[in-house]
Amino acid sequence: IERIKLRGNDQVDNDREALALANKISKPDIHLLKARLLFDGGYYARARQELDGFKPTDVKTGLEYIYRLGRIYHNWGKTDEAISYYAETIRKGENLPYYFAANSSLQLGIIFEKQNDFAQAKKYYLKVLNMNFDEYQFSITNKAQAGLNRIKGK
């Protein structure tokens, strides 16, 4: 961690995330971390199970919990549940500096684009561009802009 603080840079989203994490002394919540790793490995049922009984300790962990549920259900193919959790994440987090609401909005744009509901897709892609958040800003906003470009004229 100290090496990241001394030699790290913030030119790329992943480096910014590592540097921000190194500068924050608090440890990540173990249940959220396990759920994220299980999700990344494609173990959606186990990731969902890891979040059973989770109790948020602050606003950020509460928001991440809702966001993680949306991501799990989305990749699990349970779109209606994902939409509900993404919408809740946006409602609770769009004015906070965390990336959860912005990425939820991006994911809703993607979902509605795939459903050929271009008006809704545009609404959520534009919402991303109007949010202020710290983590993954470059990649999330670029993906939202790419989504807008894809649906232009539809």
Regions found by a protein language model. Give the residues of each.
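Extracytoplasmic and endomembrane cell-envelope/extracellular-matrix remodeling and assembly machinery
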Residues: 1-53
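Solenoid-like repeat scaffolds
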Residues: 18-25, 52-60, 90-98, 129-135
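Generic helix N-cap/helix-start motif at coil->alpha-helix transitions
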Residues: 23-33, 58-68, 97-103, 139
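Residue-level recognition of tetratricopeptide repeat
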Residues: 36, 71-74, 103-105, 110, ...
